[in-house]
Amino acid sequence: MFRTLLKSKIHRVKTTQCELHYEGSCAIDEDLLDAANIVENEQVHIWNIDNGERFVTYAIKGQRGSGMISVNGSAARRAAVGDLLIIASFAQVHETDVATHQPQLVFVDDANRQVELRHHVPTQQL
């Protein structure tokens, strides 16, 4: 049996562009793609912290070191410049590998530069 588990997350990135008439996708600074282990054309889930919108698209490379997060195509109607987003991808993990699976969790500063990398989500407390 396979389970769908969180593979990658880029947490609280700031939207830098919205390009309605671009071909689609989400352009992500290549440094962040590398840190999160997300490849070009990989499906990503995007959750907008500011307005609650959730949508699925695919990742494309944004200029390395630029901090770019550009929501493109029809998804551009789901975000505005300055909105905080969570970008996530998932993987099918075999049951025998679930216990050792470690996602890449990337945390950024206000300029969308990586400041921390974790491999687990802490247990939520009351």
Curated annotation (Swiss-Prot):
Its main location: cytoplasm. One of its GO terms (molecular function) is aspartate 1-decarboxylase activity. The modification Pyruvic acid (Ser) is found at residue 25. The active site is at 25 (schiff-base intermediate with substrate), 58 (proton donor). GO terms for cellular component: cytosol. Substrate binds at residues 57, 73-75. SUPFAM superfamilies: ADC-like. It catalyses: L-aspartate + H(+) = beta-alanine + CO2. Its cofactor is pyruvate. Binds 1 pyruvoyl group covalently per subunit. Is synthesized initially as an inactive proenzyme, which is activated by self-cleavage at a specific serine bond to produce a beta-subunit with a hydroxyl group at its C-terminus and an alpha-subunit with a pyruvoyl group at its N-terminus. Pfam families: Asp_decarbox. Transmembrane segments: none annotated. Keywords: Autocatalytic cleavage, Cytoplasm, Decarboxylase, Lyase, Pantothenate biosynthesis, Pyruvate, Schiff base, Zymogen. Its EC number is 4.1.1.11. Heterooctamer of four alpha and four beta subunits. Catalyzes the pyruvoyl-dependent decarboxylation of aspartate to produce beta-alanine. Belongs to the PanD family. This is Aspartate 1-decarboxylase.
